[in-house]
């Protein structure tokens, strides 16, 4: 046992200790600065390729003295980065309000022989600290005195009640932390203790966990990996097309137009013109609206997920949830309610209910506050709640019973006794409550030993905490003499547990159906962890074996190489320490899994930070919430399943937009390529292309993002980790629609060229409007991608989608009717509008027919 001076530290010793060990403040994780948040947006691979396009566009602009396209691309970059920055900064601001920490809570310490109350931040190593029921332990320390002391370690180990003692004979060898050690951030559930502070601030267990929670994982988000591949593909395609156009145009100029016959100045100017056209193709290959659109989709999902109790702090987490293949969850407070509840109380004598209620109420030091929350020992509080459910109010019963003597619970005795003068019968009664095997041994024979033993065995099999109640009349006024002399009546056994949240089994079932493995990682006992897993549908005694369950001690003893062959089969890890969970996450990621971690305690923070997505509980510790990407405001595991549905639906919507956007680019590049080969000018102006590529695409992204999440995505397996964002089905649709559009548009151009010998502004206006409405109707094909329903079904849930489409159509009509020289248009007759809208709609009708045939197959 640690040596200490009961008088505490002197003022000089306090100052010296503070100089050596510092203040009792855990260094909070640094919030990203405004500039870092903004700079992070430029790490997006598509933004980088846009920056390159902007530089090339500026170079072309200097040659042609026209910077319209350059300004458009730069505006697209600014909008995309600023929107993402604003939404993440706003989420960070909301989170700060949610997660304020108070280090000024008063703590009782003995210093220089006198009791003082000092702020928690001022406690130093060596201080003698006094703790009692309801208080939070301010520092790590070793107990020098413990009276009926029970600690709620749920924030560190997941255990609600841990007995603490200074008697080595009663130490628990299986406990996660020694029985005479108490840790910062845990709470005193019952009793009283005196401790000597051994570590403060960052040196405490909570401080070390917090430090680990700031270590950044180098894992790239699934969406970023996809966008990196997409940007490389776009870049390569642009370069190949650019080289092809340069070679074709140069060959045509040399072999058909006799370029080499002119003077060197004319040749140089012509070659420069060819080079600028080919560079323009690279610029055109870049989808300017894509970053803005993806950012908008993520931002809108952030806002809409907030309505389902998911406060998203980091934007990428919206989509990453859809790629999750494994969820590692703690038990206490996430799967369970983090409060004890009497599941069953079996009576063994004929004592009237009112008298039994008096015995339970009087022989307890717990209270229920005005909200019904338990103050004091959680198991005793659960008994009071049980009385309330039976229609018995403990307060008048306790007030009516005069307390004669009380013997508090201790780890050594394993029972509590109270002598009362009954307010109901007027008799003097000794009331006893404690471990069933201890209390039963004090009772008079009643022939029920076998029945009681069988009942207790059943409760133990269900990992319940059991508490026996007994009583006897007595003439004694001393508890110990009364218990020794009396032949107690065995009144009953209460079986308590931390109950599973009502919505958890269904939510876990949804995740399992969606192909997501769920793993429980808890500091609780193996039996309790298995029972909870059984209740939520995760553990099957007939199917699961010891290979699916491991203790923290076994886990720590194995090498990474040994564990890599085991972790994917693991369903439960019990008696886990904080860093075990982080190591498990790292190993699962090495196996190719995308890991989400849930937790509410300080012990969960390192894993929350290291996971692909960290999900903390709204009522969790500040350390856990700081380390997470998403905070579940309703503390519900069901919100995790909802977040997965949102993530998968969001990824599908992003795919739809990529399909829509790249179809536009594919068609525009093909038209430009053919035009360059045949020597015709580009039929679309830069301003018209910017309207299509930036403004219209932004509206299209909003339309796709507005689509409601589809519950059907939860029937699918997680997408393969290395699956490209452009699937084969997308590529087929893209090329088919793109080629049809190009054929229609080029057909129009060649027909006009043959019949009229040139292109008028009216014809170019018809061309522009046809191009836009082909994209307009193609949005329906994008909406219908990977769905089992007609795009025109579920109109009620897609109101925003159709309103945005209406805005695009109205915008196009206004541009044509009033755009004039800026957009190079002239007004069209209503019959021309009818022909354009009607004929271009065939691309949506055709897509609908193809999908209907596919559904029948």
What label would you give each PLM region?
Residues 720-734:
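Hydrophobic alpha-helical transmembrane segments and their immediately adjacent juxtamembrane loops
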Residues 707, 733-748, 773:
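Alpha-helical transmembrane segments of multi-pass integral membrane proteins
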Residues 750-759:
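Long hydrophobic segments that form regular secondary structure
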Residues 696, 741-742, 765-780:
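Generic alpha-helical transmembrane segments
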Residues 1-717, 725-726, 739, 753-754, ...:
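Conserved cytosolic headpiece of P-type ATPases
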Residues 760-764:
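Transmembrane alpha-helix entry/boundary detector in multi-pass membrane proteins
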